[in-house]
Amino acid sequence: MGLTLTQKILSAKVGREVKPGELIEVDVDMVLGNDVTAPVAIKEFEKIGIDRVFDNTKIALVPDHFVPNKDIKSAEQVNIMRKFAKKHGIVNFFEVGQMGIEHALLPEKGLVLPGDVVIGADSHTCTYGALTCFSTGVGSTDMAAAMATGKAWFKVPEAIKFVLKGNLQKWVSGKDVILYIIGKIGVDGALYKSMEFTGNIKALSMDDRFTIANMAIEAGAKNGIFDFDEITEAYVKGRAKREYKVFERDVDAEYSEVYEISLDEIRPQVAFPHLPENTRNIDEVGKVKIDQVVIGSCTNGRISDMEIAYKILKGKKVHPDVRLLIFPATQEIYLECVKRGYIEEFIKAGAAVSTPTCGPCLGGHMGILAKGERALATTNRNFVGRMGHPESEVYLSSPAVAAASAIAGYIVSPEEV
């Protein structure tokens, strides 16, 4: 049998064909850490007792979870990163003012490219598979080892193929597609497998693909990965500062399962507490009142997400009982929002607009929920206590549903505002 897209990339790194279940060691093209995970990795790295990192251009340190520093502990965490970056001449350390949410920032800067093998000490490192690379999350100890050796080990995953057909309806986006898929297969439906997306992927923008790959981990996947096409090429062109290699799956590649997804049939989705698999069509949600709406995160903080929110919010007001928080994912996206007039309209509508940060997504800061409060968010997880008090609730949706709901005061379709 032939090789899947993930097998093709890993085989090229190993220098021979690899099979699912094999344990392999490969050279990595990028090692990533943030202000939660990198300080732990740095301490482990220093225990190894070597003088330098394997390559100061292939490590990215991005403080994004608790920045701008929310307290003394978070300030100390970032300072560990800052000192390490200076000591080892880490080229890709992003200080406050340059940083963004890591999984939006690295593709934007051209630091992850097609054909790469990327590891990050953050579970949503799988985002970069939208660019036809193998990327996956690891622990801080694996990050430390990779910073020292430039290598990582994996068990080669089996793969599931998702064949996309048709086109998206109005107000339906990549977020709705991935919530629909997770609702279909469950949070363990792709456990330690590669989710490979093919078919009519031209129906999806690059931002849609980032969103879908980002949430592959919410189905338990090792990685999510898209075919390379002209949309991928257009995104990478002008960003890539080094050569990259495009891989294609074999026509006779073996998959553990194959799903056909009819994009035409997908309506806006909402994931109910407390798992991303608890999805319902917007028409089946009912009148769920909300206290807070969050638009942003590594899942939905890109310029197209901001544009959708702008189109819905323009000339309208946020419901008086709702707090609307908007987080452009990077400084570049924030600046583009300013240039296009989005920020002005957000503020006129009654939203609070923040510098890039993960903020409330992980219950960090800038939008923590109190007991009994309910939020609708464009983030990727809605576990118990994820955004604050254990007795609060988080619902997940697209930016379109989130913006419309902020106006209505309850979860609603964009068609209704």
From Swiss-Prot:
[4Fe-4S] cluster binds at residues 298, 358, 361. Its EC number is 4.2.1.33. One of its GO terms (molecular function) is 4 iron, 4 sulfur cluster binding. It catalyses: (2R,3S)-3-isopropylmalate = (2S)-2-isopropylmalate. Disulfide bonds: none annotated. It comes from the Bacteria. Pathway: Amino-acid biosynthesis; L-leucine biosynthesis; L-leucine from 3-methyl-2-oxobutanoate: step 2/4. It is an enzyme of class 4 (lyase). SUPFAM superfamilies: Aconitase iron-sulfur domain (SSF53732). Binds 1 [4Fe-4S] cluster per subunit. One of its GO terms (biological process) is L-leucine biosynthetic process. Heterodimer of LeuC and LeuD. HAMAP family: LeuC_type2. Catalyzes the isomerization between 2-isopropylmalate and 3-isopropylmalate, via the formation of 2-isopropylmaleate. This is 3-isopropylmalate dehydratase large subunit.
